[in-house]
Amino acid sequence: MTHIHDLSVREQAAAIRGRELSPVDIAEHYLDRIDRLADRVGAYVTVTADLARDQAKTAERAVMAGEEAPLLGVPIPVKDLNMVKDVRTTLGSAAFADFTAFTDDNVVAFLRQAGTILLGKTNTPEFGLPCYTENDVAPPARTPWDLERSAGGSSGGAAAAVAAGLAPAAHGSDGGGSIRIPTSVCGLFGIKPTRGRISQGPIVPDLVGLSTSGPITRTVRDAALLLDVMAGNAPGDMYRAAPPEGTFLEAADRAPGRLRVGRTAVPPVSAAQVHPDCLAAYEAASELLAELGHEVEDIDTPWKEELMPHFEVLWASMATMTPVPPDREERLRPLTRYLRERGNAITAPQLLRAQAALQLAVRTGLPRLDQYDVILQPTLALPPVPVGYFDEVGPEENFVRQTLFTPFTSVYNVTGQPAVNVPLHWTDGGLPIGVMLAGRMGDEATLIALSAQLEEARPWAHRHPPIWD
């Protein structure tokens, strides 16, 4: 028997347009599952049940009136780092547990215009800084494939929701791997778009260009459709990506042709050791790419370890950008306080020198990579880790552990290139292990076309964790 949550985003949208499914019935189906299962996987911080029901009724009237929108009546939750007007927005922090957003972020406005329904705000770590989702406002986000293990972060709640069938897809964001990390450990497809593809406005500044919103889905085509909806700019955006040729959904239906793929599993952090399961996923993906006719070559990474301190300067500086009232500083978690202390000690010249060093590295490294259509790497150096693995040590060692877990992802936030996680591999113990594909600036289309080819050759959307049924 097929349940509503078995259907993809595109299938739900088509069923709504064809009046085979009601937006009200879809919303109620997910709200029931959320009520029963969400806390087990730590998916949501806030569930907007009344709003979802009202929006679903409005969508149903629009369908009956013959109105059209690409995602009319389809539920898509929003990560709790992004503002949705008149909805509680905690930023994953007890310091903001009672904050209500006063406006929509631009990406939320784009999702509204597409006709989506808001089920709620998904779980995120404090200010989105860690690569795991454990905070003081919601239960830990857990991968539905093993409830003892973390769903990653910082879009951990979004990935847990989609993998557990508590949303057909989700909005996420990625400033150092925060879409690719949780989609790897939850067995999903995720896109970190090109810098400037999706507006960061109107409130949150992105002075260093690391972070962007993006889709978290079960299928490549769903992600392409969501990216079409989420992409857009607004006055005041510092970065704007070149417009794509055609839609991203069209790219998913296009054969990629024979591509030149550079591959490396050497982390730019010498202390990081890539786990055999992650190497197995990487090697299997390499073999599949070769079988599909692509030219796969080993390459040397141009990203060197001496760049990491410069990235850490940016990361610690970003931790200071959220204005926390002085009387609420004590509510912050130890890692956040540690990063903010580091950030507040950084001088303006130090920050500018770090940005300059990273920009010089990008200017030197990108020409070496641009001779390849795609770069293949492990998404993570380790399989999913137990809940509590990072917090069982002090903040400084916690940050080191995060670096060793995620040595590959943040470089593409620095360069601004698009990158995706492709869920091609599961361990013998049933844990998902993703691989990462990165493309040229502005070329999400090639990544989407190649990922769709990989999905057709080795499908994954039919695989579900035990909690699914």
How should these model regions be labeled?
Residues A52, A62-D136:
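Acidic/His- and Gly-rich active-site-bordering loop/insert found
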Residues T103-A234, N413-G434:
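Short glycine/serine-rich loop segments
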Residues K192-E283, W303, A449, R458-W468:
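A short helix-breaking turn/cap at a secondary-structure junction
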Residues M1-R53, E291-G293, R463-D469:
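An N-terminal boundary/leader segment
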Residues E20-L31, K57, T247, P276-D300, ...:
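Acyltransferase
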Residues T364-P367, E397-V422:
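Small-aliphatic-rich amphipathic alpha-helix that forms the alpha element of a beta-alpha
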Residues A94, D98, Y239-R240, P309, ...:
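Short, surface-exposed loop/helix-turn segments at secondary-structure junctions
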Residues L71-L91, D253-A265, L314-L366, P378-L382, ...:
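Short helix-loop capping/hinge segments that flank enzyme active sites or metal/cofactor-binding pockets
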